[in-house]
């Protein structure tokens, strides 16, 4: 009985291979194509995140605006405990303009950027002067990128 099942399975596999699914254009190539598609999406996501971080550190609200979807959502780290949710490109850009004015010396250093498809997690250190002394805070941003723009940015901090 077992040898009949094995023979049947081998025959089915041989039929599959001979039908062209195992050759060019078949299963292996589809798998590679999917890997390449995911890799391309992750590269595109990384480019958007790098551009966002660069514009942020230049305090360039107009450059940030160009990187946001119209329905973008930003969740700030304050007020504690849950932060403030800001919805829509215009409101988010207005928030950042004010933030840049209040934090003219602020700089974010990305320690690590982890990309998975259209999502990215950025581990960062926020640095500025506070009361004349260097000060820093560590945190994480979770981004969602859609069609080459930031659709969501959720910020979390330690402490």
Model-derived features: positions:
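Bacterial N-terminal signal peptides
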Residues: 9-20
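Bacterial N-terminal signal peptides that target proteins for export
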Residues: 1-10
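Hydrophobic/aromatic beta-strand elements that line small-molecule binding cavities or substrate pockets
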Residues: 108-113, 126, 138-143
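A short hydrophobic beta-strand element
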Residues: 117-126
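A solvent-exposed, acidic/Ser-Thr-rich amphipathic alpha-helical stretch
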Residues: 65-111
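Hydrophobic pocket/interface hotspot
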Residues: 52, 64, 72, 88, ...
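Short beta-strand edge/turn micro-motifs at domain boundaries
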Residues: 27-30, 136-159
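Short, low-complexity N-terminal intrinsically disordered segments enriched in polar/charged residues
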Residues: 2, 23-66, 70
């Amino acid at each position: 009985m077992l040898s009949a099942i094995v023979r049947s399975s081998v025959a089915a596999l041989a039929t599959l291979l001979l039908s062209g699914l195992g050759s060019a254009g078949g299963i292996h190539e589809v798998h590679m194509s999917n890997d390449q598609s995911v890799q391309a999406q992750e590269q595109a996501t990384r480019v958007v995140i790098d551009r966002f971080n660069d514009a942020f550190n230049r305090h360039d609200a107009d450059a940030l605006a160009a990187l946001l979807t119209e329905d973008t959502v930003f969740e700030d780290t304050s007020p504690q405990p849950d932060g403030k949710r800001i919805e829509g490109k215009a409101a988010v850009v207005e928030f950042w303009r004010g933030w840049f004015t209040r934090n003219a010396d602020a700089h974010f250093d990305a320690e690590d950027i982890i990309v998975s498809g259209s999502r990215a997690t950025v581990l960062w250190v926020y640095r500025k002067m506070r009361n004349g002394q260097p000060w820093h805070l560590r945190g994480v941003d979770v981004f969602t990128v859609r069609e080459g723009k930031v659709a969501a940015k959720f910020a979390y901090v330690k402490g």
